[in-house]
């Protein structure tokens, strides 16, 4: 399971012109699910997302986690993170999970996030989404569990 974390001042996801998820300061995470991923992969990714130190402390060092600052978590499914881009000029998606598995694991990740953290929002799995964000830094990390 891949998670592309971006520290944001704010972010929102729209589907069909309607906002389906929004946060203020926090992290936007694009989630790519692969065939070998399991609930354990989702648990490991969630632990990283909530505890990875991406926010600045009083000395300006990235020493604080999402939990510590009480920021928002916006999860957005993005199967293109699992793309094979090594050859040619067109991405291959055979390394992406089938939609049923992807939906199941994304829903699991989202439900666990809502149990573990108070400010959680999400995009809509499989939808054509427009993601708006103000990247803070920019600070971006790619996790691969």
UniProtKB/Swiss-Prot annotation:
GO biological process entries: D-amino acid catabolic process
EC id: 3.1.1.96
InterPro entries for the chain: Daa-tRNA_deacyls_DTD, DTD-like_sf
Quaternary structure (record): Homodimer.
Entry's free-text remark on domains: A Gly-cisPro motif from one monomer fits into the active site of the other monomer to allow specific chiral rejection of L-amino acids.
HAMAP family referenced in this protein's UniProt entry, alphabetically: Deacylase_Dtd (MF_00518)
Protein name, as recorded: D-aminoacyl-tRNA deacylase
Gene: dtd
